[in-house]
């Protein structure tokens, strides 16, 4: 929160606490009454949560990071807070990413349709043919999206990608049927008979390729990273429905529109490929040698590209989107790039917790670790801490600590930092947990790394 008087910040905090699924909000008045100057806080606590013109609030939800209700809460907090406030964190990232996908999905689907339509109008032999193809595939896409109802839910990433992927993967089947039908029309006087033969030949041609495509998508279901299963099931369904549409819906459309389709035919812009084919046959040893020679640099390029894969989804977002602006502001004002949370057994002795915090603060890149012990400075006795604050940092089973880091989420540096912090934590509490954006992304990196191998 920037450039806001203390009393207004307190009012803002109260409004945020009223948002559905906000479990609690921690700020200065969670520790002491506003009549007590903030400077009486322990120096460590004051300096890390305040700058000359900004202060931080910690918001906790009673729902999961990516739940719809959490994202609704993020949107409501932003609307309440206004332009003086910047909301960061994993939930804010997921909210912005989902909103961006939903906002841009109609745009890139429309672009895909327009590009496919333009290419087919020029490279196929009919002006009306592309629209018939798109109508048939559009029906298959709607059937596929509708049948996702039986899955219960799908990832917004799968939803954003599936329509365009299905269009790209299944378009060839329609082209096969069209060419086969035109060939059979020259052999049969009855269009229906010609279409029946064309369907038979098309099925023979596309069955093998579609089965291998479906098998490829189903293989994604065996990934440890369950987004693969989500995408694999949806796309396998999409290919199957695309094949069924190609031999049921599309033939019906072609037969109904046969006259206008034939009247709007034109010469294809694709030149005769006979000379090229003859040249390939004559020079096939040279092509074989060329491709063998390219294997080594291609493998090196593959290895280099896979070693530089990035996992920070924030890098995918525009610079002016809320999350990116907020995380940049947090870095500029407080030097914080990511936040971890530590849960330790509530029965862990206070001395052990203090020793653990001391060790964690020595880990490279850790800006500070903050827990109940940090709130108890020499000027604030333990009994002066409000029960509300104690309840939020200590429950019946756990003690909560916040660790702020100078390292960005999903970076190699924060990965090493998470490993070091986990090692320290397990020495003091084998059942303790390190959670947050960076630990989550590290788990995802480890999981997908295993899948990629």
Task: Give a label for each model feature.
Residues 1-94, 309, 314-453:
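Structured non-transmembrane domains adjacent to transmembrane bundles in polytopic membrane proteins
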Residues 65-309, 409, 416, 426-453:
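Membrane-embedded transmembrane helical bundles of large multi-pass transporters/channels
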């Amino acid at each position: 929160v920037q450039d806001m008087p203390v009393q207004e910040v307190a009012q803002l905090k109260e409004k945020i606490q009223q948002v559905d699924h906000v479990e609690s909000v921690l700020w200065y008045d969670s520790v002491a009454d506003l009549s007590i100057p903030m400077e009486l806080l322990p120096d460590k606590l004051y300096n890390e949560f305040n700058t000359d013109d900004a202060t931080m609030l910690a918001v906790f939800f009673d729902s999961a990071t990516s739940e719809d209700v959490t994202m609704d809460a993020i949107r409501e907090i932003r609307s309440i807070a206004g332009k003086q406030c910047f909301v960061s964190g994993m939930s804010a990232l997921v909210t912005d990413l989902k909103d961006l996908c939903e906002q841009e999905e109609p745009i890139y689907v429309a672009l895909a349709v327009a590009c496919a339509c333009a290419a087919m109008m020029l490279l196929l032999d009919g002006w009306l043919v592309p629209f018939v193809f798109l109508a048939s595939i559009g029906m298959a896409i709607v059937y596929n999206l509708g049948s996702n109802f039986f899955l219960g839910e799908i990832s917004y990433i799968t939803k954003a990608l599936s329509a365009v992927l299905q269009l790209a993967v299944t378009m060839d089947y329609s082209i096969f049927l069209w060419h086969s039908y035109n060939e059979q029309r020259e052999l049969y006087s009855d269009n229906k008979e010609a279409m029946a033969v064309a369907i038979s030949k098309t099925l023979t041609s596309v069955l093998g390729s579609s089965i291998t495509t479906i098998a490829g998508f189903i293989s994604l279901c065996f990934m440890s990273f369950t987004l693969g299963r989500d995408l694999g099931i949806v796309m396998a369904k999409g290919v199957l429905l695309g094949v069924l549409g190609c031999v049921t819906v599309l033939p019906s459309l072609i037969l109904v529109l046969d006259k206008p389709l034939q009247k709007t035919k034109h010469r294809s812009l694709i030149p005769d490929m006979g000379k090229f084919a003859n040249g390939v046959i004559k020079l096939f040893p040279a092509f074989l040698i060329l491709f063998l020679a390219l294997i080594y640099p291609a493998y090196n390029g593959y290895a280099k590209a896979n070693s530089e894969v990035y996992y920070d989804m924030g890098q995918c977002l525009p610079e002016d989107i809320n999350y990116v602006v907020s995380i940049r502001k947090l870095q500029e004002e407080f030097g914080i790039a990511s936040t971890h949370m530590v849960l330790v057994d509530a029965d862990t002795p206070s001395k052990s917790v203090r020793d653990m915090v001391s060790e964690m603060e020595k880990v490279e890149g850790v800006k500070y670790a903050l827990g109940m012990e940090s709130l108890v400075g020499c000027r604030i006795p333990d009994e002066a801490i409000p029960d509300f604050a104690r309840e939020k940092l200590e429950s019946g089973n756990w003690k909560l600590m916040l660790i702020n880091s100078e390292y960005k989420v999903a970076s190699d540096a924060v990965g090493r930092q998470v490993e070091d912090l986990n090692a320290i934590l397990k020495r003091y509490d084998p059942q303790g947990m390190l959670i947050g954006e960076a630990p989550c992304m590290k788990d995802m990196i480890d999981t997908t790394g295993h899948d990629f191998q």
